[in-house]
Amino acid sequence: MKSPAPSRPQKMALIPACIFLCFAALSVQAEETSVTPQPPDILLGPLFNDVQNAKLFPDQKTFAGAVPNSDPLMILADYRMQQNQSGFDLRHFVNVNFTLPKEGEKYVPPEGQSLREHIDGLWPILTRSTENTEKWDSLLPLPEPYVVPGGRFREVYYWDSYFTMLGLAESGHWDKVADMVANFAHEIDTYGHIPNGNRSYYLSRSQPPFFALMVELLAQHEGDAALKQYLPQMQKEYAYWMDGVENLQAGQQEKRVVKLQDGTLLNRYWDDRDTPRPESWVEDIATAKSNPNRPATEIYRDLRSAAASGWDFSSRWMDNPQQLNTLRTTSIVPVDLNSLMFKMEKILARASKAAGDNAMANQYETLANARQKGIEKYLWNDQQGWYADYDLKSHKVRNQLTAAALFPLYVNAAAKDRANKMATATKTHLLQPGGLNTTSVKSGQQWDAPNGWAPLQWVATEGLQNYGQKEVAMDISWHFLTNVQHTYDREKKLVEKYDVSTTGTGGGGGEYPLQDGFGWTNGVTLKMLDLICPKEQPCDNVPATRPLSESTTQPVKPKEAEPTL
């Protein structure tokens, strides 16, 4: 048996070092030149804890978004002085000292709108700005207007926005796409990264890194000028995700970076804090208390890191799918995250070349090639025949098939034969009458069966098309669009997630009621409508009968549901 060349790990380590050392200073500079706003649990200390534990509001996010009417230190001092007095009323104290978030206005669409007309009419309804942000507001100011998901949310979210922007582009709103890219670039320049959302309590983590793909989308309209303009911010974001890599030894992890024993560099999700999330304070405390065998701080970090993944929550992160307290997000190397990092490296190479820096472009290409090899080596389950996450504790690829397995196809990082196997696995295990299942496990969590989410439908559709698997790709689009149309026909809204075991039903689970709006569903629906309908005959609703495609000779109806575990 051939033994591995001893110099290979060192060589792999040296390749990125020159880039990471060049750009590490960029993220540090952003942190040093801005005063990072403190989240409400730090600003208000025991008052915040007491209000959340008292459950004064049905949604823990309400008080996390409340705006102090004066200096929080003064409010806290008043609270300490008054709290033990006879007749003290905590709710009254909160009402006097805080301005609570306003309920979002319920949008009643005009009657008789088609699906496309409904979505186009929603864009201005979902547009917000931070022009009137108060001094002590947890809402982080942004220079341009932005589109929120809808429903419960008053802030913009990172990875949601990419799929929303796909829809904005389809609707011809390139000005809004440009505004949102500018906002995210502003956050990178100000905070060193793009937070989960523009709230102070989201600053300790990011979300799936789609910024480079946003810039690439904008470049479809503005050309290479967009790539050159936002190259510095893309480099800063890359430095954030790779922060600490220059000092990593084989087998170690630091924040978001993982260095395996052979020197392979991959990434994981990570939150810099290990306390309950302000927006889910009581729930996180209860989850930690339910497992006394683990340190509470460890559970808090893994809960927060799962929120950073966008998949909050899923059996994907758990040892026991029925027990949230067994999640261990930080010891899992996700296949979707590393696919996005590969794509970021490829776009950085393209942008560097556009800027005339061929040497730097070659460096990023080298990093992308190394990561692609790492994905193929560590994130492919040969026994099962699909891509999966890598477990840092067992030092093995995990067995569970999830919709995240389609990300290597989405970014063109998959080997052709493996993409073909993924198509088979997708059709056999994940495709349902109402779209693509997130997993095949029923845990009660929202990122599990029977829920399907718009971004994952689009990633799968695009990924499979990239490898010539048009039939499965079109099956996913048709099934999901049918679900969206049936729900819209009944409820006159698009929702955050769908039950894909059938059609016409919104999804369940999660930490809050089902939301309507809905940014990323709007965007993906428009993209899929244009995919299934001929360009010469664009459709405003999902056709009653599936249009013929290259791979079909007659209209197809959705298949019957496959039993889930």
Curated annotation (Swiss-Prot):
Q: Where is the signal peptide?
A: 1-30
Task: Report the EC code(s) recorded for this entry.
Answer: 3.2.1.28
Q: Name one GO molecular function term.
A: alpha,alpha-trehalase activity
Catalytic reaction(s) noted: alpha,alpha-trehalose + H2O = alpha-D-glucose + beta-D-glucose
User: Which residues are noted in the entry as substrate-binding?
Assistant: R152, W159, D160, N196, R205, S206, Q207, R277, P278, E279, G310, E511
Subcellular location per the Swiss-Prot or TrEMBL entry: Periplasm
The alphabetized list of GO BP terms reads: cellular hyperosmotic response; trehalose catabolic process
The record's keywords, sorted A to Z, are: Glycosidase, Hydrolase, Periplasm, Signal
Q: Which domain of life is it from?
A: Bacteria
Reply yes or no: does the keyword Signal apply. yes
Transmembrane keyword on record: no
Q: Where is the active site?
A: D312 (proton donor/acceptor), E496 (proton donor/acceptor)
One short Pfam name that applies is: Trehalase
Q: Which InterPro entries match?
A: 6-hairpin_glycosidase_sf (IPR008928), 6hp_glycosidase-like_sf (IPR012341), Glyco_hydro_37 (IPR001661), Glyco_hydro_37_CS (IPR018232), Trehalase_periplasmic (IPR023720)
What are the TM regions of this chain, as residue ranges? none
* PANTHER family, per database record: TREHALASE
Which HAMAP family does this chain map to? Peripl_trehalase
Function field: Provides the cells with the ability to utilize trehalose at high osmolarity by splitting it into glucose molecules that can subsequently be taken up by the phosphotransferase-mediated uptake system.
Instruction: Describe, as the record does, how this protein assembles with itself and its partners.
Output: Monomer.
* Family (UniProt): Belongs to the glycosyl hydrolase 37 family.
Q: Indicate what this protein is called per its UniProt record.
A: Periplasmic trehalase
Q: Tell me what organism the protein belongs to.
A: Shigella dysenteriae serotype 1 (strain Sd197)
Gene that encodes the chain:
treA
